[in-house]
Amino acid sequence: MTNIRKSHPLIKIINHSFIDLPTPSNISAWWNFGSLLGICLILQILTGLFLAMHYTPDTTTAFSSVAHICREVNYGWIIRYLHANGASMFFICLFIHMGRGLYYGSYTFLKTWNIGVILLLTVMATAFMGYVLPWGQMSFWGATVITNLLSAIPYIGTTLVEWIWGGFSVDKATLTRFFAFHFILPFIISALAITHLLFLHETGSNNPSGIPSNMDKIPFHPYYTIKDILGILLLILTLLTLVLFSPHHLGDPDNYTPATPLNTPPHIKPEWYFLFAYAILRSVPNKLGGVLALALSILILALIPILHTSKQRSMMFRPLSQCMFWLLVADLLTLTWIGGQPVEHPFIIIGQLASILYFSLILVLMPLAGIIENNLLKW
């Protein structure tokens, strides 16, 4: 009799994906973040589902329904803060996961990488719409400012913005549709994540050396299941520490004031994980130019496989490229800091220089470093 694990139509798929999957024997802790993202997604869907049971997507009651969840629903406060801070953990894992792909050359798996870029855009859209739902001051003004950017598109811009709003300003119709999209998108993300895994398992995982490891593979279970469980426990520990000790630390105080179109907050800014893109947007004086820079700051990731010039896949043995990579990380941290600062000297010029450096690193300096390293190999 054959093992049910290998013969059952459904269990067979799980077996090939998580149990008998041949995995490189030398993948480091940086490879843990894919499974952590899966855990984050499950956590967000579950907490979001319970929040949706008590939330009302209406401009008059949205803010008070969130207050009701925190005050009167059994353990509502922990569900709400797990969901809000879970989004931050999601993005931390996402940025590290992408950084690892960039460092070790995983972007050469074209299909997997492109699905990953689509996943990033979908997760960003979901997080943005989720931030609007509590209907605080920053929710309302954030929605107004970001959706208004589309009006920079020539000819159809204004019509497009009013179509998204469902009226002539951010109002009840906008909140209702944002709630509907925020509810459905995580399920689309789940489908995309499965596709992402499907394409990954077509080629097998990359490893730190970037060298094909077909002659040295080990089964995923028990080696990497144990390793993933350790990562999951550390993730849960970090998230619970954040939720139980400082749940508001990553939020904005302005969002605890109910939304009013009559007065604007002194500094409109998105959640911390969008600040780097927001800084790039603000660093261009022209509106359309800013919107294009904002879009390109994310879409440029799709160009990275084309810009790979090195004969080696991974940066493990490429010190010059490593310097460029860490310069990019430092630049993104600088942009994140600038995005949260007011628009005044010296922050304007720092933001502009950091934005120029961001695009220069990806489009010019990193490919150039690859070419230089290729020539050094000939010596």
UniProtKB/Swiss-Prot annotation:
GO terms for molecular function: metal ion binding; ubiquinol-cytochrome-c reductase activity. Its cofactor is heme b. GO terms for biological process: mitochondrial electron transport, ubiquinol to cytochrome c. Binds 2 heme b groups non-covalently. It is found in: Mitochondrion inner membrane. One of its GO terms (cellular component) is mitochondrial inner membrane. Pfam families: Cytochrom_B_C, Cytochrome_B. Heme b b566 binds at H97, H196. CDD domains: cytochrome_b_C, Cytochrome_b_N. Keywords: Electron transport, Heme, Iron, Membrane, Metal-binding, Mitochondrion, Mitochondrion inner membrane, Respiratory chain, Transmembrane, Transmembrane helix, Transport, Ubiquinone. It is a multi-pass membrane protein. It comes from the Eukaryota. A ubiquinone binds at H201. The chain crosses the membrane at residues 33-53, 77-98, 113-133, 178-198, 226-246, 288-308, 320-340, 347-367. Component of the ubiquinol-cytochrome c reductase complex (complex III or cytochrome b-c1 complex) that is part of the mitochondrial respiratory chain. The b-c1 complex mediates electron transfer from ubiquinol to cytochrome c. Contributes to the generation of a proton gradient across the mitochondrial membrane that is then used for ATP synthesis. Belongs to the cytochrome b family. Heme 1 (or BL or b562) is low-potential and absorbs at about 562 nm, and heme 2 (or BH or b566) is high-potential and absorbs at about 566 nm. The cytochrome bc1 complex contains 11 subunits: 3 respiratory subunits (MT-CYB, CYC1 and UQCRFS1), 2 core proteins (UQCRC1 and UQCRC2) and 6 low-molecular weight proteins (UQCRH/QCR6, UQCRB/QCR7, UQCRQ/QCR8, UQCR10/QCR9, UQCR11/QCR10 and a cleavage product of UQCRFS1). This cytochrome bc1 complex then forms a dimer. This is Cytochrome b.
